[in-house]
Amino acid sequence: MDGIFGSTGVWFLIGAILVWFMQAGFAMVETGFTRAKNAGNIIMKNLLDFCLGTIVFVLLGAGLLMGEDALFGLVGIPNMGVFTDFANYDWSNFFFNLVFCATTATIVSGAMAERTKFLSYCIYSLVISAVVYPIEAHWAWGGGWLSTAEPLFGTTGYFANVAYIDFAGSSLIHFVGGISSFIGALLLGPRWGKYLDKDGKPTLVRKEAKYV
């Protein structure tokens, strides 16, 4: 069978559900290495990564990722296919990319823990979910320029005619999330009050949130 109930669609859904549970894993890891007073803030930010990300991904991100190529394969053409082509829409692929979008955003929350205000983090989450992840994921997973580039390993052998493959998101998700985390930590600086006070003097390490 084709579509969401075909073998590919079912496999996409199973994989997507497993990835979705990574949100809980991220929440436990991050609350485990932050102070107990910030545990609620961390969990709420991880929850909003998915909630806010879903809204902007439906409205804009899905079109940029899965839409028809534009600008030499750099972006997809934004569309409202999720609403206008409801019956024939590729829902399994949509959900698969939605949870990966949330994962990309949540990777950064660990680096931003105890460094940002809640509103500032929400703005970041909207931007990476609506624009950053959809555009760079389109390059390889949406038929963009990386997936249609000249073969990297020639036209013969096991990797014949392969341009670029990211099987599980090592570059599109984890590399992008890591780079975003590094930039954010570099711009914001250390977590004042956890190890050093504002005068640079060591502080007593307080009780951590023992969720992990």
Model-derived features: positions:
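Hydrophobic alpha-helical transmembrane bundles of multi-pass membrane proteins
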Residues: 1-212
